[in-house]
Regions:
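Beta-propeller-forming repeat regions
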Residues: 1-323
Length: 323
């Protein structure tokens, strides 16, 4: 935990005994309904868990209590927060990255149990049942067809995994069918090293499109709803293994940003509101495995928070809009 404004570090948890690998992805979510944000995360070779925030008086003073989310899901690469069943409470979407372990080649959404402090496991609902092969990476969640129910998309990187290199989403069937398997819709195949995908009305036509990156390959693109025609945003950036979408310049349309860990460039893509992007290089000596949009300094504009990869750092980029 890094506490603003001086970013003093507090260690809130050390890796579980026997847990292998690194914590690749995480979310903040109020699990226990006490009004503060808890933390949900994963070890790349183990099961998802959450850390109970002890409250504002002691959150920065030591360890948080760890509790399990699921005892079978293994090799998690992404965890997202969103209300999937429209009950007014956030759920978590988690993929099973390991094809031969846990619920291999599947993606689930998990609802918070009635008593999360004592539950052995959350309520798991497998919507992508064995049809998320190929090294599924990062999910995006949005209502693509305007029916009030959120779809879930993912990119699959391919090698060394079989049957990858695609972007797809799963159609949320809504109501009583939301807890079962959903229909998979392929957006595009032959997308070498596909990873990140997020919803955004890119061209301002009122339809929600998908914005995506080939995080183990080259390029950032967007898919136009409803034909899913591919439009290039950046054809040169290498390994854009992070993606964030927001109105960074506050002009009423959605922009995007990424960092290519091979290119070592942090890029901001300025949208003109019609799906045409101007490319801005914010840094040319930085790597990334994840990039988030946050108002880091509380000045009312959106900054960028970057978790470095080979650069082994955590940095943020101040939006000059409100300077």
């Amino acid at each position: 935990l890094f506490v603003a404004p001086d970013w003093k570090e507090t260690i809130v948890h050390r890796l579980f005994g026997g847990g292998g690998g690194a914590c690749i992805h995480s979310e903040v979510i109020d699990v226990d309904g006490d009004g503060d944000l808890d933390w949900a995360g994963t070890l790349s070779g183990d099961h998802p868990f959450w850390l109970e925030n002890p409250g504002p008086e002691t959150a920065h003073k030591g360890a948080w209590t760890p509790r399990m989310i699921d005892l079978e899901i293994t090799g998690v690469h992404c965890i997202r927060r969103s209300d999937i069943d429209n009950d007014g409470r956030d759920d978590l979407i988690i993929n099973n990255f390991e094809p031969e372990k846990g619920i291999g080649d599947s993606i689930s959404w998990l609802s918070i149990p009635t008593d999360p402090l004592n539950a052995r496991q959350w309520d798991r609902h497998i919507f992508a049942d064995k049809d998320a092969r190929g090294g599924s990476h990062y999910m995006g969640v949005g209502d693509i067809d305007g029916d009030g129910w959120k779809e879930i998309a993912v990119g699959a990187k391919g090698a060394p995994f079989a049957d990858g290199n695609w972007f797809a989403y799963w159609k949320n069937p809504g109501a009583e069918k939301v807890k079962g398997a959903w229909k998979k819709v392929i957006l595009a195949e032959n997308q070498t090293a596909a990873t990140n995908i997020l919803p955004a009305d890119v061209n301002g036509d009122g339809k929600v499109d998908w914005l995506a990156s080939r995080g183990h390959g080259v390029g950032v693109i967007w898919f136009e709803n409803p034909s899913w025609k591919i439009h290039d945003i950046d054809t040169e950036i290498r390994s854009p293994h992070s993606l964030t979408v927001a109105d960074h310049d506050q002009d009423g349309d959605l922009d995007a940003a990424t960092c290519g860990y091979e290119s070592e460039r942090v890029m901001w893509y300025e949208n003109d509101g019609k799906g045409n992007f101007t490319l801005h290089t914010l840094d040319d000596k930085q790597q990334s495995y994840d990039l988030r949009t946050e108002d880091m300094d509380g000045d009312g504009d959106l900054d960028l928070l970057n978790a470095g990869r080979g650069t082994m750092n955590v940095v943020w980029y101040e939006n000059p809009l409100k300077k």
